[in-house]
Amino acid sequence: MAQYSQTLRSSGFTSTVGLTDIEGAKTVARRIFENYDKGRKGRIENTDCVPMITEAYKSFNSFFAPSSDDIKAYHRVLDRNGDGIVTYQDIEELCIRYLTGTTVQRTIVTEEKVKKSSKPKYNPEVEAKLDVARRLFKRYDKDGSGQLQDDEIAGLLKDTYAEMGMSNFTPTKEDVKIWLQMADTNSDGSVSLEEYEDLIIKSLQKAGIRVEKQSLVF
């Protein structure tokens, strides 16, 4: 967390007492997010954390080359709600917490509880299929960003078909493109675990399988 405080200082924010009001903290958050959200993706990925860390150390005339473990750990610190994605809201919460002493954690926890409670309850057979999907997703989410890019999807597709007994299937670039278009519901150019799970559920439903509450019905 000390590294993050250094990042705040290196972003250009100054204060004689080291504190500001909530609006001031939001201004700092916006400045940090816009500076490090390379490509305007709407999120900060592991690769974006590298300059955040190195520039923080540089502001103290120190050189530091973060390892992959350092980068992943830093990303987890920024990811306040633990969904695998660092958004502007995550950065804003950190800025408010450490620049004003005000915490918004309770609100975020409440929102997470609402999100979890509204998630459909699937029967055990479907949950077993989703567990396999989650395991495959984690295997190919090589940078731990919680998102799959083009170069990570081909392997996921191959293993998904293998789980269905089609071990000889090798996806083409066109297959990957079509699958990405189907799965990427928010059109951000990548596929999240939630989007992948939704696609699995829709595929089961199209196959005539009842996915909620009752046992599988073919």
Swiss-Prot record:
SMART domains associated with the record: EFh
GO biological process terms held by the UniProt record: cell projection organization; regulation of cytosolic calcium ion concentration
Protein name, entry field: 25 kDa calcium-binding protein
Binding site for Ca(2+) 2: 79, 81, 83, 90
Annotated keywords: Calcium, Cilium biogenesis/degradation, Cleavage on pair of basic residues, Metal-binding, Repeat
Residues annotated to bind Ca(2+) 3: 141, 143, 145, 147, 152
Binding-site residues, Ca(2+) 1: 37, 43, 48
Top-level division of the source organism's lineage: Eukaryota
Comment field (misc): The 10 kDa protein binds one calcium ion.
Example of a GO cellular component annotation carried by this entry: cytosol
Residues annotated to bind Ca(2+) 4: 184, 186, 188, 190, 195
Domain EF-hand: 24-59, 66-101, 128-163, 171-206
Pfam families: EF-hand_7
Molecular function GO labels: calcium ion binding
Species this chain originates from: Tetrahymena thermophila
Alphabetical list of InterPro entries matching this protein: Calbindin_Ca-bind, EF-hand-dom_pair, EF_Hand_1_Ca_BS, EF_hand_dom
Function of the molecule: Expected to play a crucial role in calcium-dependent regulation of ciliary movement.
